[in-house]
């Protein structure tokens, strides 16, 4: 990605307040919103609780690395196709999900990053979020949902 394109994506995300593309049922136990770079401290804090993920990446966790998740795009996609969602419970960030619509094809939604707060792992939180997201996407006529994961990371299996 060119530096110019990256900068324009970064500026758009900084100022863009967008509607959540997914409508979760009222019974869903989380409030879901589109995150912006102003939410970076909360996302960074959630990521700090998951050091094994970054160990498997062989990459130190920094605010810049987390910020890059907000702006990273796969080839051929633009910022209008990407949503970085936050799932909150009791005003606390419980999980984050990076969705790219129409990648790698028009019938697929790609989850490039998904992380659950360490205190909520192993309790079905991630499975609940993924299953509800899959149901909603299916109703929106998407046929596939691809979830990226780091090979060898037992937490993501």
Task: Label the predicted regions.
Residues 6-30, 34-40, 45-119, 130-132, ...:
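Acetyl-CoA-dependent GNAT
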Residues 118-121, 157:
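Conserved binding-pocket/active-site segment within a compact domain
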Residues 122-127:
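Glycine-rich acyl-CoA binding loop
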Residues 137-149:
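Conserved GNAT acetyl-CoA-binding A-motif
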Residues 147-157:
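Conserved beta-strand-loop-alpha-helix junction that forms the acyl-donor binding cleft
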